[in-house]
């Protein structure tokens, strides 16, 4: 008997035949056991051959741990088979073959399970390595793109290549959802593209302007994304000054620096442009005139229109023309639509001194420059109130004595006629001077004399003078000729009508 329990003895012809025959005839079970032992040896040799081929194949594949595992499995398999053979001696042959047939199937299942586990481990290691590489690459690209300009111009060719590479990497992987999440974080996808664009744009420092043309940062992979490649303007951000001069429209701004004193709305072309260009450093290209100041084009300040604060119907144009010589002006210059007004000759006083006339003109100009309000004339007597005409817009207030006579100014072409009374003119009765618009003139020639008269308005364009010597009503020309002729002789063609003989001025004249 050897170590495996097999009978190695051989039958010898000399003396051994009887023993062998005795053993054969003694029990049939011994012969059957020997046959079973031989069959078990053949089976073991066949299994060793199969196991040796499998271990050689695993050795060729380069996995060293698999060979050691297979060797252990072989040792365990042989020991288990020997134990089963020893235990099966007490059993019949049918039960032995049933036990022997089930062992190879279990070994094959165990081997397949081990191979599947190793494959899973290798695939997990490779997937983790790829994931780490992708995360490192994503971090590098994110750091690089933070300092670069952003462009959302779509590139279809690179989009297709990126999608193919992403699909090839995620085929057969159990972490497909994680990869898709990583890819979606890198790109602007679907309807949230515009919101993602604004989020990325906010991460850029505020001091740098972000341009949408010329440079590129990310590529949009979806065909439904919003395309900004054709936008011809730049997007302003915090910290970037907006140049309103380049915009095609005007930006209205509320400003309290310009105030108006009336309800009339007159457009000022330059004001809006000044308001719009206050945001930038450029100076305004057009001068601006505030609405509350009148436009001045070389005219004197006396002739400028002023605002009527008492009347809110608009701008009241009070044009005042003062003649430099004692307030005389053109005839009928203050004609208004509401009716004829008293002329400036009737409104000016008869000063005895030139200084009074200057002060009078200065007061008139000061009133017009100040607030443009109307001033009423002082009524010193009943006769003065009767002479004033209703509807006049501008009157003058002179600080002269109430008993000083007044006279209407004569047109400038009659330079010989001056306001005031003659020095030698005397009145009868109480001897007081009536408060009337007196004028005087001296006739030319050797027979000329100084006469006085009272002016009044004859029509809208003419005035008449009543002489104090005869009480005749005549034109300014006739009044000058009347002073040049002798008192006793009068021209028949002048059409002079005389007052009654009870005229105190005519009777008192020497």
UniProtKB/Swiss-Prot annotation:
Residues 31-44, 103-146, 363-389, 397-406 have a biased composition (Basic and acidic residues). Residues 497-510 have a biased composition (Low complexity). Pfam families: TDBD. Residues 1-179, 323-414, 481-510 are annotated as: Disordered. Induction: By methyl jasmonate. GO terms for cellular component: nucleus. Keywords: Nucleus. One of its GO terms (biological process) is negative regulation of DNA-templated transcription. It is found in: Nucleus. It comes from the Eukaryota. Residues 148-160, 485-496 have a biased composition (Polar residues). Belongs to the Ninja family. This is Ninja-family protein mc410. It comes from Nicotiana tabacum (Common tobacco).
């Amino acid at each position: 008997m050897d170590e495996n329990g097999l009978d190695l003895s051989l039958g010898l012809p000399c003396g051994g035949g009887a023993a062998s025959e005795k053993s054969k005839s003694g029990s049939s079970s011994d012969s059957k056991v020997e046959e079973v032992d031989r069959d078990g040896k053949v089976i073991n040799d066949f299994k060793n051959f199969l196991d040796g081929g499998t271990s050689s194949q695993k050795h060729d594949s380069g996995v060293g741990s698999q060979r050691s595992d297979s060797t252990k499995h072989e040792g365990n398999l042989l020991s288990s088979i020997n134990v089963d053979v020893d235990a099966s001696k007490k059993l019949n042959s049918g039960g032995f073959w049933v036990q022997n047939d089930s062992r190879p199937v279990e070994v094959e299942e165990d081997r397949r399970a081990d191979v599947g586990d190793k494959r899973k481990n290798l695939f997990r290691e490779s997937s983790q390595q790829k994931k780490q590489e992708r995360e490192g690459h994503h971090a590098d690209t994110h750091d690089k793109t933070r300092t670069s300009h952003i462009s959302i111009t779509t590139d279809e060719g690179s989009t297709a290549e990126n999608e193919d590479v992403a699909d090839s990497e995620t085929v057969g992987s159990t972490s497909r959802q994680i990869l898709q999440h990583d890819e979606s974080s890198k790109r602007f996808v679907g309807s949230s593209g515009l919101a993602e664009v604004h989020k990325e744009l906010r991460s850029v420092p505020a001091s740098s302007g972000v341009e949408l043309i010329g440079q590129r940062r990310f590529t949009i992979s979806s065909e439904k994304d919003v395309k900004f490649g054709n936008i011809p303007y730049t997007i302003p951000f915090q910290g970037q000054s907006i140049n309103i001069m380049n915009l095609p429209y005007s930006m209205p701004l509320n400003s309290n620096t310009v105030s108006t004193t009336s309800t009339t709305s007159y457009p000022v072309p330059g004001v809006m442009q000044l308001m719009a260009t206050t945001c930038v450093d450029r100076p305004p290209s057009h001068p601006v005139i505030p609405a509350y100041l009148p436009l001045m084009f070389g005219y004197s300040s006396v002739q400028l229109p002023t605002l009527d604060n008492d009347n809110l119907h608009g701008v009241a144009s009070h044009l005042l023309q003062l003649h430099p010589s004692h307030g005389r002006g053109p005839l009928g210059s203050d004609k208004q639509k509401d009716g004829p007004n008293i002329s400036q000759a009737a409104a000016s006083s008869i000063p005895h001194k030139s200084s009074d006339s200057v002060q009078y003109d200065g007061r008139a100009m000061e009133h017009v420059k100040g607030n443009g309000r109307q001033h009423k004339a002082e009524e010193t007597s009943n006769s003065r109130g009767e002479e004033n005409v209703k509807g006049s817009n501008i009157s003058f207030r002179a600080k002269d004595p109430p008993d000083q006579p007044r006279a209407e100014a004569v047109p400038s072409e009659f330079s010989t006629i001056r306001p005031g009374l003659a020095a030698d003119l005397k009145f009868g009765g109480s001897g007081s001077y009536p408060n009337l618009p007196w004028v005087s003139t001296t006739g030319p020639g050797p027979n000329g004399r100084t006469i006085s008269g009272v002016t009044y308005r004859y029509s809208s364009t003419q005035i008449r003078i009543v002489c104090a010597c005869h009480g005749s009503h005549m034109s300014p020309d006739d009044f000058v000729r009347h002073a040049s002729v002798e008192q006793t002789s009068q021209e028949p063609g002048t059409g002079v009508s005389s007052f009654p003989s009870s005229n105190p001025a005519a009777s008192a004249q020497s």
